[in-house]
A protein has these predicted regions:
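Activation targets extended, charge/polar-rich intrinsically disordered C-terminal tails
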Residues: 2-44, 142-285
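Hydrophobic alpha-helical membrane-spanning segments
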Residues: 7-14, 28, 55-65, 69-79, ...
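Glycine-rich catalytic cores of cysteine/serine-nucleophile enzymes that process amide/ester linkages
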Residues: 31-46, 50-124, 146-149, 230-240
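Intrinsically disordered, glycine/charged-rich N-terminal periplasmic/extracytoplasmic linker segments
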Residues: 97-98, 119-133, 184-194
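Mid-length scaffold segments of soluble, non-membrane domains
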Residues: 105-170
Length: 285
C-alpha cells in the first residue's frame, strides 16, 4: 500500500511539473480561442533580410507557437533559404493537412504562424549557407515520413526540421525543448542531437534523455521536455521553452554590406566534426 501511495504521489508531482508551464500560458491567454485559421495573421514579421539588401546566401530556422491550444505545449518550426543573388526565399516545412506533408515553395521566410509571431532560432549566411542549400533538396527528398503526420509525439513539422538538420553536418542547430516531435526517431533509439555535439536516447518520442553542447541536458517525459543549458546559462521548462541569457545557435552579426560565413563558436565533435562539406551524415542508430 505504501509503494502504491508513493507511486501515486510521484506520478501526481511529475504531471503537475509537466503541465505547469502549459497551464500558466493558458491562464495568461485567458483560455481564449484563437478564432478561425482563415482570418489568422500570416503576415511577414520583417526579421529576414530583404533579398535586395542581402546578396549572400541565407539559411534561417524559425519557430512559432502552434495554432490554438496546441501552442500552449509546442512550436511549429520551419527552414527558410535564399541562394546567393536570388530575389526570393524558399520555405521548407511539414504541414498536417495534405497527403504529401512536405512542401518547399517560394514564400515570405518569416510569416506569422496563424496568429503566432515567429522567433528566429538560427541564422547562417555566406559560403556556409550555400553549402547547406546545395544539399537541401536531396536531403528533403529522402525524408522518411513524406505522407505521415502525427501531432504528438511525431512525426510532425519539428520531426522534419530536426531530421534535416541531422543529415547536414554544417547545419548544427539546437531546436527549442518545446518543439514537440524533434525527439521522434522512428525506429531508431539513439541519435546525435541536431546541435551536432552530443547524443540522445528516445523511445518513440514519448520518453528520452538528451545531452549536447548546444542543447544542454533535457529529460523528455510524454513528449514534454525539461532541463538546463549550462552554455546558454538557461533552464528549460515544458511548454514555456528555454529561459536563457544567450543563444548557443549560429546567429549572423552585421559587419558591413555583405555577409561573411558564420563562424561556429561551439567545438564540433563526432560525425558533425569529421564530415566534410557536401557530405551527408547518418546520425541516427
Amino acid at each position: 500500500m505504501k509503494i502504491f501511495k508513493r507511486c501515486f504521489i510521484g506520478l501526481t508531482l511529475t504531471l503537475s511539473l509537466l503541465l505547469a508551464g502549459p497551464l500558466f500560458l493558458a491562464a495568461c491567454a485567458g483560455l481564449q480561442d484563437s478564432g478561425s485559421w482563415r482570418t489568422a495573421d500570416r503576415s511577414s514579421a520583417g526579421i529576414a533580410p530583404r533579398p535586395e539588401q542581402e546578396q549572400a546566401a541565407v539559411v534561417q530556422v524559425y519557430g512559432a507557437r502552434a495554432y490554438n491550444w496546441r501552442g500552449y505545449f509546442s512550436l511549429h518550426t520551419w527552414i527558410s533559404t535564399k541562394e546567393a543573388g536570388a530575389d526570393g526565399y524558399y520555405v521548407h516545412e511539414v504541414t498536417g493537412w495534405r497527403h504529401y506533408v512536405v512542401r518547399s515553395r517560394l514564400d515570405d521566410p518569416d510569416r506569422a504562424w496563424y496568429g503566432a509571431p515567429p522567433t528566429l532560432i538560427a541564422d547562417i549566411r555566406g559560403d556556409q549557407a550555400t553549402r547547406i542549400i546545395d544539399q537541401l533538396d536531396e536531403v528533403i527528398a529522402r525524408y522518411p515520413y513524406p505522407t505521415e503526420y502525427t501531432a504528438w509525439p511525431g512525426p510532425n513539422s519539428n520531426t522534419f526540421v530536426a531530421w534535416v538538420i541531422r543529415q547536414i553536418p554544417e547545419m548544427d542547430v539546437a531546436l527549442p525543448n518545446h518543439a514537440i516531435g524533434k525527439d521522434y526517431l522512428g525506429n531508431g533509439v539513439v541519435s546525435e542531437v541536431p546541435g551536432g555535439s552530443g547524443y540522445q536516447l528516445s523511445l518513440g518520442g514519448y520518453f528520452g534523455i538528451l545531452a549536447g553542447v548546444r542543447e544542454g541536458l533535457e529529460l523528455n517525459i510524454l513528449g514534454l521536455s525539461m532541463g538546463i543549458n549550462p552554455l546558454a546559462l538557461g533552464i528549460k521548462l515544458p511548454g514555456v521553452g528555454e529561459l536563457a541569457f544567450r543563444s548557443t545557435n549560429p546567429m549572423h552579426e552585421p559587419s558591413g554590406s555583405n555577409s561573411e560565413p558564420e563562424t561556429d563558436a561551439v567545438p564540433q565533435t563526432g560525425a558533425a566534426g569529421a564530415a566534410e562539406a557536401g557530405q551527408v551524415s547518418k546520425k541516427t542508430l
